[in-house]
């Protein structure tokens, strides 16, 4: 087995995060030859990242949103104009889920995407009917 440093693979995300180092997940390949599966969906990036880095504890998962939000903004040095605060652009997503864990675990559908206070995407929740055999 490969020990650290890996010749190709992921770094020690859990350890870096635990030490307070800014860790962010991202995707720069969208439907290209390097990664044809890339679609720009950061929830997919996070879902795969949590599996690949073995971040599986409930608290870790509940805090993982930072890897694709706050920490990414810090990495790109746009943290002063990022976040849900008075005076900042209203950029956010609303998922059909009770909490962050369920949004990731259930691959919850995106209900709203808001950019600069304008609704860009609105999805009507799916209606599901389950019929059990008698």
Which positions does each model-derived feature cover?
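Short Asp/Glu-rich motifs
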Residues: 1, 35-36, 106, 132
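Active-site core of metal-dependent hydrolases
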Residues: 1-11
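His/Asp/Glu-enriched, well-ordered alpha-helical/loop segment
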Residues: 9-95
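C-terminal cap of metal-dependent C-N hydrolases
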Residues: 86-134
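Short low-complexity, flexible loop/linker segments enriched in glycine and/or proline
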Residues: 4-5, 39-42, 110-112
